[in-house]
Amino acid sequence: MGPSSLLHPAFASSAGPTRRTIDLADCRERLVRHRIYGLVNSAPRLRRFMESHVFAVWDFQSLLKAMQQRLTCTSLPWVPTLDPEARRLVNEIVLDEESDELPEGGSASHFELYLDGMRAAGADTGPIDGMIEALQAGRLPQVEQPAATVGEVVAEAMRASGAPNAARDFVQKSFAVIESGSTHGIVAAFTYGREDVIPDMFRSLVSSLASRDTAWARFHWYLERHIEADDEKHAPVCRRIMARLCGDDPAKWAEASRVARECIEARIALWDAIAADIETMPAG
């Protein structure tokens, strides 16, 4: 991948010949070349990786739903939102991410696919299952509901379930963006902090898994599916939404750039922590 591919032009189709770029080449390069990918070289190490990374997979779905809430009408009574094109684009992404078609038939979210991959590989799903169960049941005695923010509720659920500290920090960054009230900030986090970088990150993991046991087949399919969907479809769509939101407003583009950079740095910090943990384990 050449340096020019790290700069993504965005065109605001509703605002004339506006052209904007968000330059994330330096931090993006550090992310896609992180040492974590070379360290995931054995079954125990991959299981350890998955046990932390699964929280980022869940976090992805939460960012997507925040984006959908901002760009479409998800409450009653229904009313049309301002940008029908953005509405259609985000709903297309939700369809794929929340209810993708499975190779054997049926549908599942990519989060559920990841959990299936973890179980098939023998990874511990206890903490992530505990977090989801706590959120579903509202069993969070340390949180004063309904006064608590969504981020506070999630933080307590993660703490109570024993989620790794680095995963908790990563998720809290995302919910800080969600609760900021900035639609273009949320879309920037999802576009440049998720969809735009995930294909290159996952390609490195796919290479590491190429000769692994069939127990990783489900996880391998999840990675391949994300690479295909994000690289060819979702990332370009997200950049179109980004352009429509920011238009020709330099302040919005500056904020989007700041949020995108902070999200990539948060991912690097998560990778640093997981790598440090994995390095205490025997090499593959």
Regions found by a protein language model. Name each.
Residues 2-284:
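Non-heme di-metal
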